[in-house]
Amino acid sequence: MTRPCDILIQAACIVTQDAMRTVVEDGALAVADGTVLAVGPREAVTAAHAPARLLDLGNALVMPGLVNAHTHAAMTFLRGVADDLPLMDWLTQHIFPVEKHLTPDIVEAGALLGCAEMLRTGTTAFNDMYLIQDATYRAVDTAGLRCLGGEGIFGFPSPAYPDADAGLDLVRRLHETWRHNPRIRQCVTPHAVYTTSPELLQRCQALAEELDLPLHIHLAETTTETAQCQQMFGQRPVPYCHGLGLLTPRATVAHAVDLTDDEMDLLASTGAAVAHNPESNMKLASGAAPVPQMLARGIAVGIGTDGAASNNSLNMFTEMTSCAMLHKLRCMDPTCAPAQTVLDMATLGGAAALHWPGLGQLAPGCPADLTVLDLSAPNLQPMYNPASHLVYAATGHEVRLTMVAGEVLYQDGRFTRFDYPALMAQMRDVRRWVLDKLGR
C-alpha cells in the first residue's frame, strides 16, 4: 500500500547529512506537510509513495539547504561601499555614518536582496542581527526562508530606538509580533562588548532567559577589540562575558578569532556555539579563528558569511571553500578542515548556531529544506566524493532549485514569491540614497 505525499523528488544523488552521513545514488525523497517523509533508493521510495507532485530532477544533486550562522542580510545595500580597511575604520568612517539615516524601506529592500542571494546560492536559513529588524522579518516573510534574528542592541541610540531601555522593549514587541510565524524566530542580540555596558549585557542575558530565546553577540573578533575590552573592563572579551553570565548553551558568539587555549576551554565548558566567518575575517584582516582547535574541544561551530558589506557576498559555497583553505594554510596541514567537516559546519553546525534542531539534514521528520545542484556543470564532473565537490568545486551558481518547508522558493532563475526585476529597480534607488548620504 502506497503512502500519500505532497512531493516526490528524484535525483542522481542525495546527500542527506544524517547521523550516518548517508549518500544515496539514484535516490528519491518524499515530502509531506513541509517535512521529509522518507529518503532512500529511487525505486524503493517511489514504489512506497503516491505523490501529488513528482519532481524528477535528472542529473542533479539534492542536499540540505545551507545554514548561514551569522550575517546581516540587509547590509547587501552597502556591498562595496567601503573596502580594504581595518574593522574599526570601516565601521566608524563608512558604515555607522550611513546607518544612522536608515529607514524601514531601505532595510527591507536590502534584506530582500540578501534573501534572493541566499536562495540563489542554496541557503535556506540564516542567523541575522541588524537594525530596524522588523523590516528584515517582512523581507524574510516575503521570500520564505527561515531566520533567527534579533534587533542589534547598543548602549547608544540606534535608528530603531532612542535608548537601551527602548531597545529591549522593542525586542519584546518583535518577539510577540513574530513568534507565531513558523519560519521566523527571535533572539536577543547585544552588538558587542565595545558598544554595550556590563549592565546592558546582563539585561540582555536576563531577557533571553525570561523569553527563553537564544543570545547572539559579536565576540573576540579582533585584537583591537581585546585591547579595548581590557582597557574598558580589565578583562579579555571571553572571560568578561562569562563573568557577566552571557556564555551559556543559549549563546552563539560570532567570530571568536582572538582566543587563548584557556578561553576555548571556557567556551567548551559553557556549551556556547560559535559562528565562524572566514571570508569577512580575512578581508578585514581580523585574523583566523582557531576552528580546528575549537572543534577538537567539542564546540559547535557553524559557518557564516557576515554581511555583504564586509565579505562581499552571502554565498555559503564559496565560504565553505574559503574555510577549508584558510585552516589548511593556518595550520600548515593539508589534512586540517577536511571536506566533510566543513560541510558539517555549513549544515549541522549552522543548525546548532541557530539553536534550531532538525535543520541541516535530510532525514525523516526533519524540515524539507533543501537545495539542488546541476551535476551537468563541468566543474562537478566526474564525481567521486560529493562532499569534496560541494566544498572544493561548487561555486553556488550550479544551484537549480531551493526549497523551504516543502515549498519551492527558487527554480531555474525564477523566484516564486516576489518580483525580482522590481527589486532591482528599487536597489538602484537605494544606491542613489547611499551615495547622497555619503556625499558622493
Curated annotation (Swiss-Prot):
The keyword Metal-binding applies. Disulfide bonds: none annotated. Binds 1 zinc ion per subunit. GO terms for molecular function: 5'-methylthioadenosine deaminase activity; metal ion binding; S-adenosylhomocysteine deaminase activity. It is an enzyme of class 3 (hydrolase). Its EC number is 3.5.4.28, 3.5.4.31. Its cofactor is Zn(2+). It holds the Pfam family Amidohydro_1. Substrate binds at residues 99, 191, 221, 306. Zn(2+) binds at residues 70, 72, 218, 306. It catalyses: S-adenosyl-L-homocysteine + H2O + H(+) = S-inosyl-L-homocysteine + NH4(+); S-methyl-5'-thioadenosine + H2O + H(+) = S-methyl-5'-thioinosine + NH4(+). Keywords: Hydrolase, Metal-binding, Zinc. Catalyzes the deamination of 5-methylthioadenosine and S-adenosyl-L-homocysteine into 5-methylthioinosine and S-inosyl-L-homocysteine, respectively. Is also able to deaminate adenosine. Belongs to the metallo-dependent hydrolases superfamily. MTA/SAH deaminase family. This is 5-methylthioadenosine/S-adenosylhomocysteine deaminase.
